[in-house]
Amino acid sequence: MGCSSSNDVEDIYLKQTEQLAQLLCKYNCTLMFGSSEDGMMGMIYKTFKRNNCKIISVLPKENYGMLSEVDADEKVYVNKTSDQLKYLVNNGDMTIILPGSFGTMAELMTSIQCKKLGEHNKKIIIFNINGFFDNILKYFKKLEQEKFDLYDQTQLYDVINDYSEIEKYMEV
């Protein structure tokens, strides 16, 4: 799961994030994430913790100390951020991307590129809270329309606009 760790995001993002986390906990999902108690990432972590769901924290050694270390059931230490991205993509059952900054975008792009290259065939879900990803989705479409990317994007990722839409992926 990738999302913002900023404490300054608007409430709409935090509310939708908490509702999504509560729904995932209902299905007893495991949280595998980049380890932060702040922002949307912290909201997800705290919701999973409160619901006694399994939490796996993946931290790069190069950033150790810059990120808050959370109380996780498992802690995985990797050498650097690029290793963290690969670990998250390769070891999760699916990737859920919520609004975030550069780290979140790196996770999204890594997930999509690895899927295109056949390294995995896992679901990638973009949670487009408040239209946050509208411009990047237009960019993806432009890549396809102008032949920079010939891959059928409908096979790469799904977009949801409300937390409740995640349920259709849980029932599979």
Give the positions of each predicted feature.
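Short, acidic/small-residue loops that bind anionic groups at enzyme active sites
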Residues: L59, L98, C114-K138, Y151-Q153
